[in-house]
């Protein structure tokens, strides 16, 4: 079997002993949602998948059957056959809504703190270690976001950009941390029920492209500043969405504004920090 790529090593790593078929379904579905596996991409052969996941053939076939029933993959026969990704997983709107309602503002802020710490180190290493061919790829991924037309494909394009940027830093641990953080919040960021001023793909794309330019020009201070501002806006958006969902039955659907003109997210973070 060929040596797996870094992405394959993350997606197809060994599974826990319990509910292995369900774990495979979840792992592959999340990889597609994060953009690690793209629509049209062929999965490794079943024998290789079984070996990488550390499962028997029957368990793997059960998982692939479930993914086919969900319309996420299809298996084609013939010389050029195999199992191919054909669709994004269906959005788990109820689960995302419950995440907003059950996650406190302090917890969302803490996610932002962790992401800021990881991203600050990652972007500085990217300025040092990224290679020339990385920049064209990152620009292509940045532009893919504004071309995406659904919340699911926007979340996928967004996370794939940030993960590829982390990969360019050539630190597997930091790249894995970025994958984990993207998995935790990116679908909520682009959720279809977000606040009235929906998260803007054009603005996010512009920020991504500006970040690529800073890395390409080896400007670590500027790149870090842009990264932290980007994460801060993301966290404020998540908090705004939480507040809107939490107050939906008693307040207007548009996000509240504090007396000084700041967003409801800023006001809530200040209040919780006191």
UniProtKB/Swiss-Prot annotation:
Domain HTH gntR-type: 18-88
SMART domains with a match to the protein in the record: FCD, HTH_GNTR
Organism this protein belongs to: Mycobacterium gastri
Name of the protein this chain belongs to: Putative HTH-type transcriptional regulator RmpR
Stretch list, region Disordered: 250-274
Polar residues composition-biased segments: 250-265
InterPro entries assigned: GntR_C, TF_FadR/GntR_C, Tscrpt_reg_HTH_GntR, WH-like_DNA-bd_sf, WH_DNA-bd_sf
Domain of life: Bacteria
Start-end of DNA-binding region: 46-65
Keyword Methyltransferase attached: no
Function (record text): May regulate the transcription of the rmpAB operon.
Keyword set, alphabetical order: DNA-binding, Transcription, Transcription regulation
MF GO annotations: DNA binding; DNA-binding transcription factor activity
Alphabetized PROSITE patterns for the sequence: HTH_GNTR (PS50949)
Gene name for this UniProt entry: rmpR
């Amino acid at each position: 079997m060929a040596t797996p790529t870094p992405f394959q090593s993350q997606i197809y790593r060994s599974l826990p002993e319990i509910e292995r078929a369900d774990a495979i379904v979840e792992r592959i579905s999340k990889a597609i949602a994060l953009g690690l596996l793209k629509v049209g991409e062929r999965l490794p052969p079943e024998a290789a998948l079984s070996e990488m996941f550390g499962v028997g053939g029957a368990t793997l076939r059960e998982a692939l059957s479930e993914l086919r029933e969900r319309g996420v993959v299809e298996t084609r026969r013939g010389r050029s056959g195999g199992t191919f990704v054909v669709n994004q997983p269906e959005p788990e709107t109820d689960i995302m809504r419950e995440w907003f309602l059950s996650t406190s503002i302090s917890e969302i802020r803490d996610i932002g703190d962790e992401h800021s710490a990881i991203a600050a180190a990652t972007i500085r290493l990217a300025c040092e270690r990224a290679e020339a061919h990385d920049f064209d790829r990152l620009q292509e991924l940045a532009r893919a976001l504004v071309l995406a037309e659904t919340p699911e494909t926007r979340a996928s394009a967004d996370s794939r950009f940030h993960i590829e940027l982390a990969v360019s830093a050539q630190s597997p641990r930091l790249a894995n941390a970025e994958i984990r953080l993207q998995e935790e919040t990116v679908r909520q960021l682009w959720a279809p029920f977000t606040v009235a001023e929906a998260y803007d793909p054009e603005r996010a794309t512009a920020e991504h492209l500006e970040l690529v330019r800073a890395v390409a020009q080896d400007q670590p201070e500027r790149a870090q500043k842009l990264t932290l501002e980007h994460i801060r806006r993301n966290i404020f958006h998540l908090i705004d969405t939480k507040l809107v969902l939490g107050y939906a039955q008693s307040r207007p659907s548009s996000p509240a504004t504090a007396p000084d003109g700041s967003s409801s997210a800023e006001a809530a973070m200040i209040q919780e920090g006191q």
